[in-house]
Amino acid sequence: MEMKKKINMELKNRAPEEVTELVLDNCLCVNGEIEGLNDTFKELEFLSMANVELSSLARLPSLNKLRKLELSDNIISGGLEVLAEKCPNLTYLNLSGNKIKDLSTVEALQNLKNLKSLDLFNCEITNLEDYRESIFELLQQITYLDGFDQEDNEAPDSEEEEEDEDGDEDEEDEEEDEAGPPEGYEDEDEDEDEAGSEVGEGEEEVGLSYLMKEEIQDEEDDDDYVDEGEEEEEEEEEGPRGEKRKRDAEDDGEEDDD
């Protein structure tokens, strides 16, 4: 199957700009060049073109979001400078099983500043003396060559890398939870409780002052009542006394007439 037909089959009624991963392994490149792949695949992050008889990268479109590129088991012998121009954000590049023979060909990868992992397994260049030391010295940005770092530690799988990233995020969340709220942060519930207590104290003060005023008013009313009662008693006492004086005066007058 030709590459152009393979691409149409892999789209599965999707628009090219919706595709983030595209696997075109084992199809056929006419004249050893890329066909059917263009700039509309702008969201592409993973592209695999293994064993497609690819010999030239000249027709590779601009794929600024591409992170991983699989080009193993082809007949590429040079022209790697195109990768830095068209895929500047590559972190993983697999050129295993190609026709790469010398360090000058690989030197073009120096401009891939984000490149961390490079595979050249089964390329003639691996037969050079001090091959690994030379590649690490030439491409100082990479961490892994043919699956191992400079201390021969094996590179983690892609799935493990994703799990590690998720784990790091979880640890960060836990650390934030343990650290508590940031400085200057105040809990709304605490603010409400404080406001409620202040209101409650204010209400108690108002209630006490109101009760005190009522007691004072009651005492004043009682005093007024006592004064009024004493005046009434005095009037009652003066009333009979006055009448008695009047009668006594009348009796004295009658005696004088006699």
UniProtKB/Swiss-Prot annotation:
Gene3D superfamilies: Ribonuclease Inhibitor. Residues 205-258 are annotated as: ZID domain. LRR repeats lie at residues 18-38, 43-64, 65-87, 89-110. Phosphorylated. The phosphorylation is nuclear localization signal (NLS)-dependent. Component of a SWR1-like complex, composed of EP400, KAT5/TIP60, TRRAP, BRD8, RUVBL1, RUVBL2, ING3 and ANP32E; the complex does not contain SRCAP. Interacts with H2A.Z/H2AZ1. Interacts with the importin alpha KPNA1 and KPNA2. Belongs to the ANP32 family. This is Acidic leucine-rich nuclear phosphoprotein 32 family member E. The lineage of its organism: Eukaryota, Metazoa, Chordata, Craniata, Vertebrata.
